[in-house]
Amino acid sequence: EIPQNLGSDIPHDIIKLPNGQWCKTPGALCSSRSECCKAKHSDSVTYSSGCSRQWSDQQGLFINQCRTCNVESSMC
């Protein structure tokens, strides 16, 4: 299950990237912001998407995961 603080409940566009792969959804492992799917209506300043460092209790280390958040809330 993907934690809600990664933005899994925020609608996002799943698009094919220039490298031919699909963008990664919130909670997926990533290495750069460009790999992550952007929130729908990301042309507004309401949402921000990117690849952020998160602590994984399961693995006992930091991992990079795609995240989408509402910039007007405390999620970002």
From Swiss-Prot:
Keyword terms, alphabetized: Disulfide bond, Ion channel impairing toxin, Knottin, Neurotoxin, Secreted, Toxin
GO molecular function: ion channel regulator activity; toxin activity
SS bond partners: 23-37, 30-51, 36-66, 69-76
InterPro entries according to UniProt: Cys_Knot_tox
Major location category of this protein: secreted
Tissue specificity comment: Expressed by the venom gland.
GO (cellular component) term, any one: extracellular region
Organism superkingdom: Eukaryota
Annotated compartments: Secreted
Alphabetical list of Pfam families matching this protein: Cys_Knot_tox
Entry text on domains: The presence of a 'disulfide through disulfide knot' structurally defines this protein as a knottin.
Function: Neurotoxin with probable ion channel impairing activity. In vivo, is both paralytic and lethal, when injected into lepidopteran larvae.
Family: Belongs to the neurotoxin 21 family.
Protein name: U1-cyrtautoxin-As1d
Source organism of this protein record: Apomastus schlingeri
Upper classification of the organism: Eukaryota, Metazoa, Ecdysozoa, Arthropoda, Chelicerata
